[in-house]
Regions:
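Hydrophobic, helix-rich cores of sensory/ligand-binding and other regulatory modules
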Residues: 1-173
Length: 173
């Protein structure tokens, strides 16, 4: 809902709303283009970076990194080593002591992870767990709209993984 509280040029309001619409439409078009031309997961996350405005990573069902944005944030701020194929065993043990893996949950999850809030959306092919997209609250607070945006992105990531199941077993970032 858009509320205009003062006398405003209706054409200016229209142009602002149109600009917002154009931004999301261009994002969707870029995602579909990537999906049709190789389904590159790191590219899909990278073009989504401007929309979600926070670091993200995508892991496969075997917990290997498939794609990551803002690697410096993960390495410097969270101490996560991305040069390995999978999570650090000690950090994973700490996480598991505090949280259930939740690989069965279809709804977006807000979690506290290493002192940062995260929004995670699992990727499913019907009931089969394919992986998880996690958006880290680092550069701006998470918004309610991020849930819908992440769910939309996950639907396209699922299609990319389905196009090439090898993507789910090796990190391609």
């Amino acid at each position: 809902m858009i509320v205009v509280e003062a006398d405003t040029d209706i054409f200016r309001v229209f142009n602002l709303v149109q600009h917002i619409f154009d931004r999301y439409e261009a994002w969707e078009e870029r995602l579909w283009h990537i999906l049709r031309h190789g389904a590159n997961l790191p590219q899909m996350l990278e073009v989504s970076r401007d929309i979600l405005s926070n670091p993200m990573h995508l892991i496969g069902s075997d917990f290997r990194y498939l794609a990551v944005t803002d690697e410096a944030y993960f390495q410097k701020d969270l101490g996560i080593r991305l040069d390995t194929e999978t999570f650090d065993a000690e950090k994973m043990a700490t996480f598991l002591s505090l949280h259930d893996l939740s690989t069965h949950v279809h709804e977006p999850l807000l979690l506290e992870l290493q002192g940062a809030r995260t929004l995670s959306v699992n990727v499913f092919d019907q009931e089969e767990y394919l992986g998880c997209l996690t958006v880290f609250e680092a550069f701006r607070p998470l918004r309610d709209s991020d849930r819908a945006l992440a769910v939309f992105l996950v639907k396209l990531l699922r299609q990319a993984i389905q196009q090439n199941p090898v993507l789910a077993s090796t990190r391609s970032a």
